[in-house]
């Protein structure tokens, strides 16, 4: 059920059964089920054992030239967490095991480095310490953290009326949510959100979040924050650029409607749309 109240998935089995790709599928539904289960396994079987979060990359040969075996990614973990929720609801993994995994994730995130309530893009999955994404990108990443929190809020809603362990999980997520200081990332009260802040480099990354790209979720969450909300002008003047986000471009005869950053005439990459 949509609110997670029906425990239809509480059955034995720790791994979605996807052994061996079938030579053919009886119908599209069977094929899509197989794909969904297989993708779920990246987050279920491939997760960092200590944190439960998604690795930035998995090398099947076990060789990591950049010594990044334990690096987990916050945004990618958000997508994976949404997948776990779907897996629980569809019975690919048991509700009990799913809650245990999600509890591990949330407990880890509560102890990991945060910067005004916001996580870094990369985290050491063993220690919870920030792994710099770039020379000056060693602090809070509002975009990646918003991808993460968007899925955590889905988890909160799914389990908030469950058993005691599930209610505790939902409550701990709510605490992390209320500690995210979206207002801090206005960089001194500007009418725009900023992508990064570092305790070592401050605002040196200097990346205001202006549309259109994959970052709309930051404004949705910022506007709805019960503790650190942003004003409407932040969206209208920052993200929507006081109307400057509109576009009249028609690549291949199709109207873009929105001005795509860096690709105003042709349109940006497709991932911008599903990310937020």
Residue ranges and their predicted role:
Residues 29-44, 81, 99-110, 149, ...:
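Hydrophobic core segments within long, regular secondary-structure runs in both alpha-
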Residues 29-35, 116-145, 161-276:
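Extended ligand-binding clefts on enzyme/binding-domain cores
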Residues 18-31, 41-42, 78-93, 108, ...:
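Well-ordered alpha-helical scaffold segments within catalytic/enzyme domains
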Residues 69-78, 82-138:
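Membrane helical hairpin/interfacial module
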Residues 1-11:
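Signal peptide processing junction and immediate N-terminal pro/mature segment
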Residues 45-47, 53-58, 83-86, 114, ...:
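Short, solvent-exposed loop/turn and secondary-structure capping segments
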Residues 2-4, 16-69, 116-118, 122-123, ...:
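Low-complexity, Ser/Thr/Pro/Gly-enriched N-terminal "stalk/linker" regions
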Residues 50-57, 92-98, 161-171:
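Surface-exposed patches in mature extracellular/periplasmic domains of secreted proteins
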């Amino acid at each position: 059920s949509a609110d997670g109240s029906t425990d239809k998935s509480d059955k034995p089995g720790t791994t979605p059964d996807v052994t061996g790709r079938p030579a053919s599928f009886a119908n599209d539904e069977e094929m899509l089920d197989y794909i969904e289960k297989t993708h779920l396994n990246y987050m279920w079987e491939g997760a960092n054992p200590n944190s439960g979060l998604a690795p930035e990359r998995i090398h099947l040969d076990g060789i990591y030239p950049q010594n990044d075996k334990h690096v987990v990614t916050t945004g990618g973990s958000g997508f994976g967490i949404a997948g776990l929720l779907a897996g629980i609801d569809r019975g690919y993994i048991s509700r009990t095991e799913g809650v245990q995994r999600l509890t591990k994730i949330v407990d880890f995130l509560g102890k990991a480095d945060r910067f005004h309530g916001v996580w870094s893009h990369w985290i050491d999955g063993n220690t919870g310490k920030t792994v710099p994404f770039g020379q000056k990108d060693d602090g809070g990443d509002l975009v990646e953290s918003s991808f993460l929190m968007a899925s955590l809020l889905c988890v909160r809603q799914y389990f908030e009326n469950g058993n005691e362990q599930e209610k505790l999980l939902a409550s701990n997520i709510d605490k992390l949510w209320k500690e995210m200081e979206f207002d801090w990332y206005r960089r001194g009260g500007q009418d725009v959100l900023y992508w990064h802040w570092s305790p070592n480099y401050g605002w040196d990354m200097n990346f205001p979040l202006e549309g259109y790209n994959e970052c709309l979720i930051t404004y949705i969450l910022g506007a709805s924050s019960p503790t650190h909300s942003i004003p409407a002008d932040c969206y209208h003047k920052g993200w929507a650029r006081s109307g400057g986000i509109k576009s009249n471009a028609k690549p291949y005869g199709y109207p873009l409607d929105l001005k795509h950053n860096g690709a105003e005439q042709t349109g940006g990459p497709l991932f911008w749309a599903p990310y937020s």
